[in-house]
From Swiss-Prot:
Record: residues binding Mg(2+) 1: E90, N536
Job description of the protein: Part of the phosphoribosylformylglycinamidine synthase complex involved in the purines biosynthetic pathway. Catalyzes the ATP-dependent conversion of formylglycinamide ribonucleotide (FGAR) and glutamine to yield formylglycinamidine ribonucleotide (FGAM) and glutamate. The FGAM synthase complex is composed of three subunits. PurQ produces an ammonia molecule by converting glutamine to glutamate. PurL transfers the ammonia molecule to FGAR to form FGAM in an ATP-dependent manner.
Record's GO cellular component terms: cytoplasm
UniProt feature coiled coil, ranges: none
Principal place of residence: cytoplasm
Family, per entry: Belongs to the FGAMS family.
Protein name: Phosphoribosylformylglycinamidine synthase subunit PurL
EC number: 6.3.5.3
Species this protein is from: Anaeromyxobacter dehalogenans (strain 2CP-1 / ATCC BAA-258)
Record carries keyword Magnesium: yes
Quaternary structure, from the entry: Monomer. Part of the FGAM synthase complex composed of 1 PurL, 1 PurQ and 2 PurS subunits.
Residues annotated to bind Mg(2+) 2: D114, D265
Length: 759
């Protein structure tokens, strides 16, 4: 007997009444409960991008290196010499807040599958994490669980986590962010896509068995949190990295045959989304026979089978007649494998169960015909007052050295060593620059002379405070800083992926933030020649009406060639000259300093001149490639003083303890405005460099050729950070504050906790 579809059931499926009316119009009848479940997940924000798609279409997505842009499992760019890179970034925010270890672990698993589905072997991962106020009772619990989940899954897969960023802000108290990025390498002429082509071709299920975990995960990821958050724990998937490792190796072996026509990861919305999307891309229909799906639990219904988000599963369209070849390879790797359907010419998506059709839907309304909203937009009403804020009226700290120590201890600025020590960043020995620097650099793990000198630079980042105060400018800063980080290691930016994390799009101010950030990313990408080739949107990041800062995370990929000629972030040799490429403006709007010292999050983000930015980057990139520099470090959170301090102490400690993990410096800074503003302001387009004295004249000439200003500041040496007329602090004290920032958060939690998982 068919269950009646009531307004309550429609609402439980996350559908608006007007959306249900559209379903009735598409079908000309009442849907079954199973069909309603299919529409629910396919029309969720997570799968349909119904609020964001109209804005995303404005991104630049093509370029001379782009082999695959948005719309597939991952973007692909040409690295030259027959080699390509596939990469993407995705969010797993809502699951990670509910169940931090499994939420983060399965986020890593999902992004790895997106990349190797394209035919690529993953070689490097990064992540961008956001947590609440360090003093919030849940922050330490989430931090420990998320980091353990990322490390646990990635380490078992043998894919190094080579970098990333972690930041803390009260807006994330009820909604942490876990954005995972993976890059893989593949032959440029062997890209696999998620398409159901070839009428009559078999549809095959490969991987782990299907259980009840994760049902309606996509719908949950498209809703705000409330007091019932803990009840959503069953919608979080459970990952098995060892199964995923088998799946990875089996897929890569299958790609060496002629058996694979199309392949798609079963991620959000599971078998439903993967099969519908493949049918949509192929312009065909699909018949699924759910009796053939390998099941882990007894008594599962068609509804549960279709909407399960059990992990480590792939849907594959094989060439007709190649079923046994696929089966033999999958069984060799101890994977479940079954023919569960056929490609049809009907243009319809049908699910069969025990001889009956339990779902019969047209493909188009589930894909391109899904709702597309032009939601109302309006600037945030608080912005005029925030922009009018005058920082000049604030008192200047009596002790600038003490202010620097406090900034260095802020978890957003402090050393992330506690985090990356839990990740295996040395597996496969691909790292050319260790974690903790501006950008990760990985060698291409391929045995070919033409590739031996190629490396890839990777950077992720965004400043959510900037994006709140000025979404357009803040998003441009995100792209510019990633490009600047890549320039610091001698890389040439190629392309970006993004992960756009926002609050409730039904609020006009949130939709305005989103649209402005998209516009900012697009304009900056056009300026840098870095098309957007993949990405993800995560909306409804709110808890009981409180939204996060707009957080459009950017992940950028650059080419480093030759990879032997790169650069580190830390001062190297006593006597080296220290210089600033860029200028001194003392812009503190939206800065970490303003928040830390004065409790203010106001003003405007620093101005950004893209022509100046490109000149600064080109100067440093060319200097690195010419071997002129000992170090190069981007000035960002905390400003010039923090950049100087980090350059003094971001050293690996020698195993024999023969020298300390720091070196001092003495500089003289011209102060055009207040000293604290110049020291801690986060002016754009600045890179701190050090270089041997004999290279100084050549470097200044190079900067003039590129049109970038250079200010000579001082020299490396000693055991103190000395800024003439401002501060003098032992580097050992700076290092102690900097290294203890995150461990202090965990100690505070342990001291007053006594419970494993605070409510």
């Amino acid at each position: 007997m068919t269950e009646p579809i009531t307004p309550e059931i429609v609402a439980q499926h996350g559908l608006k009444p007007e959306e249900y009316q559209r379903i009735l119009e598409h079908l000309g009848r009442t849907p079954t409960l199973t069909e309603l479940g299919v529409f629910s997940v396919m029309w969720s924000e997570h799968c349909s991008y119904k609020s964001s798609r109209v804005h995303l279409k404005t991104f630049p997505t093509s370029g001379p290196r782009v082999l695959q842009g948005p719309g597939e499992n991952a973007g692909v760019v040409d690295l030259g010499d027959g080699l390509a890179a596939a990469f993407k970034m995705e969010s797993h925010n809502h699951p990670s807040y509910i169940e931090p270890y499994q939420g983060a672990a399965t986020g890593v698993g999902g992004i790895l599958r997106d990349v190797f589905t394209m035919g690529a072997r993953p070689i490097a991962s990064l992540n961008a994490l956001r947590f609440g106020d360090p003093s919030h009772p849940r922050t330490a619990y989430l931090l420990e669980g998320v980091v353990a989940g990322i490390g646990g899954y990635g380490n078992c897969m043998g894919v190094p986590t080579v970098g990333g960023e972690v930041a803390f802000h009260p807006s994330y108290n009820g909604n942490c962010l876990v954005n995972a990025f993976t890059l893989g390498i593949l032959p440029a002429d062997k890209i696999f896509r998620g398409t159901a082509a070839g009428v009559g071709n078999p549809v095959m299920y490969v991987g782990a068995k299907t259980g009840r975990d994760g049902i309606h995960g996509a719908t949950m990821a498209s809703a705000e949190f409330d007091a019932s958050t803990e009840e959503k724990r069953p919608t979080v998937q459970v990952g098995d990295p060892f199964m995923e490792k088998l799946l990875l190796e089996a897929c890569l072996e299958l790609f060496q045959t002629d058996a694979v026509v199309g392949i798609q990861d079963m991620g959000a919305a599971g078998l439903t989304s993967s099969s519908v999307e493949m049918a949509g891309r192929g312009g065909n229909g699909l018949d699924l026979f759910l009796d053939q799906v390998p099941l882990r639990e007894e008594g599962m219904t068609p509804y549960e089978i279709l909407l399960s988000e059990s992990q480590e599963r792939m849907l594959l369209v094989a060439a007709e007649g190649k079923e046994e070849l696929v089966r033999s390879i999958c069984e060799k790797w101890d994977l479940d494998v079954a023919v569960i359907g056929r490609v049809t010419a009907s243009g319809r998506w049908r699910a069969h169960w025990r001889g009956a059709v339990v779902a019969d839907l047209p493909v188009d309304p589930l894909t391109e015909g899904a709702p597309k909203y032009h939601r109302p937009m309006a600037p945030h009403p608080a912005l005029p007052a925030l922009h009018a804020f005058d920082a000049a009226a604030l008192p200047e700290p009596a002790d600038l050295g003490a202010a620097l120590l406090r900034l260095l201890a802020r978890p957003t600025i402090a050393s992330k060593e506690w985090v990356y020590r839990q990740y295996d960043h040395m597996v496969r020995l691909v790292g050319a620059v260790r974690p903790g620097g501006d950008a990760a650099v990985v060698r291409l793990a391929v045995s070919h002379d033409a590739h031996a000198h190629k490396g890839i630079a990777l950077s992720v980042g965004v400043n959510g405070r900037f994006c709140f105060l000025d979404p357009y400018l803040g998003a441009m800063h995100a792209v510019a800083e990633c490009a600047r980080n890549i320039a610091c290691v001698g890389g040439e930016p190629i392309a970006i992926t993004d992960c756009l994390n926002f609050g409730n799009p039904e609020k006009p101010e949130i939709m305005w933030q989103f649209a402005e950030c998209v516009r900012g990313i697009g304009d900056a990408c056009r300026a840098f020649g870095t098309p957007v080739v993949s990405g993800n949107v995560s909306l409804y990041n709110e808890t009981e009406g409180q939204g996060i800062l707009p957080t459009p995370t950017v992940g950028m990929v650059g080419l480093v060639e030759p990879v032997e000629r790169t650069c580190h972030s830390t001062f190297r040799d006593a006597g080296d000259v220290i210089a600033l490429v860029g200028s001194l403006q003392g812009e503190v709007g939206g800065s970490e300093y303003l928040s830390a010292e004065h409790g203010k999050e106001a003003g405007r983000p620093p101005a950004l001149d893209l022509a100046r930015e490109k000149a600064v980057q080109e100067t440093v990139r060319r200097a690195v490639r010419a071997g002129l520099l000992s170090s190069a470090h981007d000035c960002s959170e905390g400003g010039l003083a923090v950049a100087l301090a980090e350059s003094c102490m971001m050293h690996e400690v020698p195993a024999d303890g023969s020298k300390p993990a720091w070196i001092g410096c003495a500089v003289r800074i011209p102060f055009p405005v207040r000293k604290d503003f110049v020291l801690f302001g986060e002016d754009a387009s600045r890179i701190l460099v050090s270089l041997p004295k004999e290279n100084a004249a050549r470097f200044v000439d190079l900067a003039q050729q590129c049109g970038a200003p250079v200010i000579r500041l001082g020299a490396v040496g000693g055991d103190r950070l000395e800024i003439q007329g401002a501060l003098s602090v032992p580097v050992e004290d700076l290092a102690r504050a900097w290294r203890d920032g995150i461990p202090a958060v965990l100690r505070r939690d342990a001291a007053h906790a006594g419970t494993t998982a605070p409510a």
